[in-house]
Amino acid sequence: KPDRNCSSDICKEILTNINSAQSTIDMAIYGYSSTPAIEKAIKNAQARGVKIRLIYDVDSKNQNIYPDTFKFVNLIANSKNDGGIKDSNATMHNKFYIFDNKTVITGSANLSHTDMSGFNFNNIIVINSKTVAEIYKSEFEQMYAGKFHSAKNISERNEADGFKIYFSPQDKALTNGILPVIREAKTYIYIPIFVITENRVVEELINAKKRGVDVRLISDALNASKKYSKIQILREAKIPVKVENYAAKMHAKTLIA
């Protein structure tokens, strides 16, 4: 069962970086559900002079999917959201943190108790690189200045220290980042994923299977039987898809090739 404790390795990593931050923390999150250790760390960081800024998602009614989001917003004076923009149905679905302009944490985990407790399965990556942090900072500054979704400028730079970084929608992450990796795979493609709906991804996975690549997926059960899911198409192409059916969510969005 999920709890409110910061018991997962993911939460502990985020907490450690909040506690060790010396000057700045910039966060772009989908939403928040209460994890007391995170709230305490944020309060302590601000008390020792760390400047914290927050960007979060709201819908067309200025609401957030998580009930504790606005409680979290009230802890942080410097907060902005994507409300009131022309793309009213678009979602600010980021989950990234920039610490002291030198460390970036990003991945599939929301700042929710179901993810922070380790109940749901997620992945994060911790990148200790000032140049990568600069790229994320540029994206953050656009949103903090009120540019969201289709209003954002294309990133001036998307490579640093061995990483390729694409922000949606402006950098065309699917076309420029994901599809080329699938097309160039020669041995295997392993994908743990919450849901797969994109026709172009399915087409390229089937093409990879046909050229002898070992393609395998693990999908969350919640979406597996929905009309928009492409699992059946993949299975008909002889691609094995395991559907996780335990109580929690397979919430990862990962491609290994």
Placement of each model-derived feature along the sequence:
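Long, repeat-rich segments with strong aromatic
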Residues: 194-196
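HKD-type phospholipase D/PLD-like phosphodiesterase module
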Residues: 1-22, 31-183, 203-257
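Short alpha-helical functional segments enriched in proximate histidine and acidic residues
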Residues: 28, 192
